[in-house]
Curated annotation (Swiss-Prot):
Subunit: Homotetramer.
Keywords of the record: Carbohydrate metabolism, Cytoplasm, Isomerase, Magnesium, Metal-binding, Xylose metabolism
Swiss-Prot/TrEMBL cofactor(s): Mg(2+)
Native organism: Yersinia enterocolitica serotype O:8 / biotype 1B (strain NCTC 13174 / 8081)
GO biological process assignments: D-xylose metabolic process
Name of the protein: Xylose isomerase
Domain of life: Bacteria
GO cellular component: cytoplasm
Record: residues binding Mg(2+) 2: E268, H271, D307, D309
Compartments, as annotated in UniProt: Cytoplasm
Amino acid sequence: MQSYFDELEQVRYEGSQNTNPLAFHHYNPDEIILGKRMADHLRFAACYWHTFCWGGADMFGSNAFERPWQQSGDALALAKRKADVAFEFFHKLNVPYYCFHDVDVSPEGASLKEYLNNFAVMTDVLAEKQASSGVKLLWGTANCFTHPRYGAGAATNPDPEVFSWAATQVFTAMNATQKLGGENYVLWGGREGYETLLNTDLRQEREQIGRFMQMVVEHKHKTGFQGTLLIEPKPQEPTKHQYDYDVATVYGFLKQFGLEKEIKVNIEANHATLAGHSFHHEIASAIALGIFGSVDANRGDPQLGWDTDQFPNSVEENALVMFEILKAGGFTTGGLNFDAKVRRQSTDKYDLFYGHIGAMDTMALALKIAAKMIEDGQLDKQVAERYAGWSSDLGQQILKGKMSLEDLASYAEQHNLNPHHQSGHQELLENRVNRYIFG
């Protein structure tokens, strides 16, 4: 196989003082952090779609990249060439996982039969690539939003035949994910939403997508898939309003359809931005609700109202995110997938490495800082002290349902309660976090 990235052997850790742009400066896979290898904490994955499928087109311009596998020719042969380059990239980046949509790795074809045949061929190709490289599949998913048939959604489409086609894609992609040893399966409702309420039956569409998710869960149990099912929240784009708006909305949906024990969330930083939340908020919310699963690590631009999918570069933001994840016990089947793309002007093929190296170093440094926060214990101590009253006899009786409103009213009167506000010490805590980060 002819090498595509022929000027690079493999990206390696060379230390923070090294100036080699094709080396890691903070990501040392074998470094032990809180008793575990750094690589096992972070569980990095590179995505197929932005890295190997996007041609550099945007709303105002055509493809800007010259990728050999994106030229005209035999679609299946080009898909195999793309797989060659992808696994060369994964190996040279030293990333343990990858992620894909079905049509990222396989030509969709002109019919359902062609789609199924192509995907079967490419699943075997990927299996061979994984076996020879040691790279594993973090998660697979189905693209049920790009094709024109999905203009009005997939599971929420007014046409049950479109619903059925989407079900076929998800059925096939789930089976491929299982065959490839995928540790999760993701459901992102790219067009599960509406443009206008004038032609939308909200209750009908909610029932449709609820039933779709129930069928996904049923299929998981029928086939014995051991991975985690994940929904990826996003508030809008491409639709005006999407039903999986944010973590809290997804949790309400899961509760409605009895799926809160079956499906968790894959949280993307840029989607949190679009929903008007911080990335930290969405991670903490998912953990508090018991549905935290995995992360799409990227960043958005707060001055822009769309999904820019830039590589993460804020140690400050991600240190707090990793702090929450570590406190919750870390990833189980999930990981940090870089759902990010180089900028349209970044046309050098090695820009793909620069973007991922910077992101991996960012998350590695964030992990180290989060570990300092854990080991120091002062942030947790401050929070525990703030809520200490709820460990008292009064607090416990309230929480255990042993006191009614009337009981509390009597208690307050009998004890002549006159509580005073206690400082939240926000500035003190912010200063402490800055010292962890900057020393």
